[in-house]
């Protein structure tokens, strides 16, 4: 067990406040100059590591003293993290750099419950922190033989282009009732209890235009990508999702696809390349392309509800800002679409801040998802079961040695509740990361007051008729693995058949798309799926839309009968160019007695699984 090292750094505010200066983030109109002075409180004879696992900074912001607590983001890189670039003659060069002693941190401001921080300590302090509701940026001043830093509000960075920046995903909701319903729900501790952590293994690709923009400096590009993902990781922690960087590929000699200003074309090409090339070389869950090409009218585009799909678990992002925080928020936004999150409506809220999933980029980038985003994300996860993000990082996946006090449970630790000053776990000895005498457990869904829960105590609620509840064994603090009823078992009074823990029926799918008073349409509506046109088809093969055979028409586009007030649409359907798959009948849906949908065919349930 390695003892946590607490380091204090005093930053004295320089008496001069600048009026204007050009920094990495752009032209800044109002800033403070501070000088970091590192004061180390190490035991006599102790060897100071290059980058401590826990640090504390004292500094003045607007003349007021604040304390910034930082902890190393030990889950930033995966164990098998790799980097790929290309020689001038096109030869692939892949390396596996040692990244365990990295310099990327998350943190908070003391006595500010709503504060956040994402900081790189590689060469001075660079990043952002939120203090009393305002976003501040910090970075070293590039002065010879000087440790001067600039601290400034994000709002004081001059914006070169004041035009509104939009996400390219469009919504054709004919009813906003589902979003309104979600906005009225409250995130409860009980609801969170049944949401197991998810783990997204992210792969980044940087195009040739970005290489040119950075004058071929690959190290500069890599550092920027690390800082961006560190912030994305911070953002998703509050969604109970951990984002780890598993790979970075830089198209240093030439683009591997044709990158065009037309975002839809580029996203489609990138998805095809990921499916046929990248996935054959590197296992990952989600890929994002960063480009310096000026995308027409948008700054990002992604498929909706596509996480884990070989082609569609992708997004593209325009690197339109020099501020890493801004690009990180765009990346979190596009990945949010992959996780089933739509743009926020007027019903959605994230407190007093602008929310990440608003269609346009906020004048001040937010690091908060709305209540609607939370429920849409977890509705997608629980109902569509994207299996690739189920593998939670185990202790053996943490690439650096175990460190007591970093709030990560690692090999050799019985518990880890943070530093002794911050630990709030009555079962855990924060100094040793061992359970206190008499304690059986310190965490887990089957741990109550430091003891194993009684046998039979429900620890994971039933999410559907096909997903029975799990109960504690009385011998462990962990809830047993989530077990579903066998696929094909009848459910909902024979209206459907179980599929991956759900009972998919068309009525529920119509409700999810259009809200209340909408039902499965008459059979005649589904005959439109025999056309093989842009919306009516059963499946796609090599990019071509295949019309449904007569016996398969209920396994193509979903049609619903809208009986809501003021509506009279007997064959209502949903179609979007950005996400053609949305609005199709879901796999496993009953299409006839004894038959279910499988890959666009209506097949016998006995042979489907």
Swiss-Prot record:
Annotated positions of the Pyrrolidone carboxylic acid (Glu) modification: 190
Residues annotated to bind Ca(2+) 3: 467-468, 470, 482-483
Residue ranges constituting the Disintegrin domain according to the UniProt record: 401-487
Post-translational modification: The N-terminus is blocked.
Annotated ranges, domain Peptidase M12B: 198-393
Stretches that traverse the bilayer: none
Cofactor note: Binds 1 zinc ion per subunit.
Cofactor annotation: Zn(2+)
Name recorded for this polypeptide: Zinc metalloproteinase-disintegrin-like VAP2B
Residues noted as binding Zn(2+) in the record, renumbered to the chain: 333, 337, 343
Residues bound to Ca(2+) 1: 201, 285, 388, 391
Family named by the database record: Belongs to the venom metalloproteinase (M12B) family. P-III subfamily. P-IIIb sub-subfamily.
Pfam families per the UniProt record, alphabetical: ADAM_CR (PF08516), Disintegrin (PF00200), Pep_M12B_propep (PF01562), Reprolysin (PF01421)
InterPro entries: ADAM_Cys-rich, Disintegrin_CS, Disintegrin_dom, Disintegrin_dom_sf, MetalloPept_cat_dom_sf, Peptidase_M12B, Peptidase_M12B_N, Reprolysin_adamalysin
Signal peptide: 1-20
């Amino acid at each position: 067990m390695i003892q946590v090292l607490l380091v204090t750094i005093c930053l004295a505010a320089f008496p001069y406040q600048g009026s204007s200066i050009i920094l990495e983030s752009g032209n800044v109109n109002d800033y403070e100059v501070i000088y970091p002075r590192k004061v180390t409180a190490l035991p006599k004879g102790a060897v100071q590591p290059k980058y401590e696992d826990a640090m504390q900074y004292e500094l003045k912001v607007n003349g007021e003293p604040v304390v910034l607590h930082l902890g190393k983001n030990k889950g930033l890189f995966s164990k098998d993290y790799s980097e790929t670039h290309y020689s001038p003659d096109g030869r692939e060069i892949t390396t596996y750099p040692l990244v365990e002693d990295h310099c990327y941190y998350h943190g908070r401001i003391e006595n500010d419950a709503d504060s956040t921080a994402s900081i790189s300590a590689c060469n001075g302090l660079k990043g952002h922190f939120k203090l009393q509701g305002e976003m501040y940026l910090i970075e070293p001043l590039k002065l010879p033989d000087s440790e001067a830093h600039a601290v400034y509000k994000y709002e004081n960075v001059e914006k070169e282009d004041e035009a509104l920046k939009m996400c390219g995903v469009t919504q054709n909701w004919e009813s906003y009732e589902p979003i309104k319903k979600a906005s009225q729900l409250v995130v409860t501790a009980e609801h969170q209890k049944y949401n197991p952590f998810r783990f997204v293994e992210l792969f980044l690709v940087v195009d040739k235009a970005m290489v040119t923009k950075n004058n071929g400096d690959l190290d500069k590009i890599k550092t920027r990508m690390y800082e961006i993902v560190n912030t994305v990781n911070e953002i998703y922690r509050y969604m109970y999702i951990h984002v780890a960087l598993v790979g970075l590929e830089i198209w240093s000699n030439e683009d591997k696809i044709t990158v065009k200003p037309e975002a839809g074309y580029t996203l489609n090409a990138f998805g095809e390349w990921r499916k046929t090339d990248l996935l054959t070389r590197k296992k990952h869950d989600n890929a994002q392309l960063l480009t310096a090409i000026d995308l027409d009218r948008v700054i990002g585009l992604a498929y909706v509800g596509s996480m884990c799909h070989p082609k569609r678990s992708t997004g593209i992002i325009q690197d339109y800002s020099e501020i890493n925080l801004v690009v990180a928020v765009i990346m979190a936004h596009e990945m949010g679409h992959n996780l089933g999150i739509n743009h926020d409506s007027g019903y959605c809220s994230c407190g007093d801040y602008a929310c990440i999933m608003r269609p346009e980029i906020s004048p001040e980038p937010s690091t908060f998802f709305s209540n609607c985003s939370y429920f849409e994300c977890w509705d997608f996860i629980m109902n569509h079961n994207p299996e690739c993000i189920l593998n939670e990082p185990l202790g053996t996946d943490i690439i650096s040695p175990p460190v007591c006090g970093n709030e990560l449970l690692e090999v050799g630790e019985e518990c880890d509740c943070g530093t002794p000053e911050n630990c709030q776990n009555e079962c855990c000895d924060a100094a040793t990361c061992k359970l206190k005498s008499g304690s059986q457990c310190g965490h887990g869904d089957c741990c109550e007051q430091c003891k194993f829960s009684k046998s039979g105590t429900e620890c994971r609620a039933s999410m559907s008729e096909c997903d029975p509840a799990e109960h504690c064994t009385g011998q462990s603090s962990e809830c047993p693995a989530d077990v579903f009823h066998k696929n094909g078992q009848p459910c909902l009074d024979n209206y459907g058949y179980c599929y991956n823990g759900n009972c998919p029926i068309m009525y529920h799918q119509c409700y999810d798309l259009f809200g209340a008073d909408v039902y499965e349409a008459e059979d005649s509506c589904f005959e439109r799926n025999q056309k093989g046109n842009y919306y009516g088809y059963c499946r796609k093969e090599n990019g071509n839309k295949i019309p449904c055979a007569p016996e398969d028409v209920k396994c193509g586009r979903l049609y619903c009968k809208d009986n809501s007030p003021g509506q009279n649409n007997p064959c209502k359907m949903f179609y979007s160019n950005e996400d053609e798959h949305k609005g199709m009948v879901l796999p496993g849906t009953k299409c006839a007695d004894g038959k279910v949908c499988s890959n666009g065919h209506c097949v016998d349930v006995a042979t489907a699984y």
